[in-house]
């Protein structure tokens, strides 16, 4: 059975979609841009944007009763491949801090993202039986 995930710890949807969907064994997040859920502010720096997007993904996964370690796949959309190394540093630090194995990942450059942010991240997490 499908359950919609909603949390105040991640920014609300800016279109006709939900933050996440829990299918029981799997959780899918919508793409998370670096919007602070409390203030609506967007950091200017790509490092801060990457960290905030990861924290927003984490908030949705946690709202579903899972943890960072349950994430098995991430897709990262970036507007400038020159930011790839910087984003990788933040990404590595985030997963290391949570003592989680790195999930599979795709990273693609796109022309533009909502609110002209530098990146967007979505995830798939799996609930162990």
From Swiss-Prot:
Keywords: Hydrolase, Pyridoxal phosphate. PROSITE patterns: UPF0076. Pfam families: Ribonuc_L-PSP. One of its GO terms (cellular component) is cytosol. GO terms for molecular function: deaminase activity; identical protein binding. The modification N6-(pyridoxal phosphate)lysine is found at residue 58. Pathway: Amino-acid degradation; L-threonine degradation via propanoate pathway. One of its GO terms (biological process) is L-threonine catabolic process to propionate. InterPro entries: RidA, RidA_CS, RutC-like_sf, YjgF/YER057c/UK114. The keyword Hydrolase applies. Its EC number is 3.5.4.-. It comes from the Bacteria. Substrate binds at residues 105-107, 120. CDD domains: YjgF_YER057c_UK114_family (cd00448). The keyword Hydrolase applies. May be a post-translational regulator that controls the metabolic fate of L-threonine or the potentially toxic intermediate 2-ketobutyrate. Homotrimer. Belongs to the RutC family. This is Putative reactive intermediate deaminase TdcF. The lineage of its organism: Bacteria, Pseudomonadati, Pseudomonadota, Gammaproteobacteria, Enterobacterales.
């Amino acid at each position: 059975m499908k359950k919609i995930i909603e949390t105040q710890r991640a920014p609300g949807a800016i279109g006709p979609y939900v933050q996440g969907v829990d299918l029981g064994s799997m959780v899918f997040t919508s793409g998370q841009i670096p919007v602070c859920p409390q203030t609506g502010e967007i950091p200017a720096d790509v490092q801060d944007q990457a960290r905030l997007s990861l924290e927003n993904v984490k908030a949705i996964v946690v709202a579903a009763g899972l943890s960072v370690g349950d994430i098995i796949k991430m897709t990262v959309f970036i507007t400038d491949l020159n930011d790839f190394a910087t984003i990788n540093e933040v990404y590595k630090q985030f997963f290391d801090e949570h003592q989680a194995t790195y999930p599979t990942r795709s990273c693609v450059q796109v022309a533009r993202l909502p609110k002209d942010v530098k990146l967007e991240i979505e995830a798939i997490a799996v609930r162990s039986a």
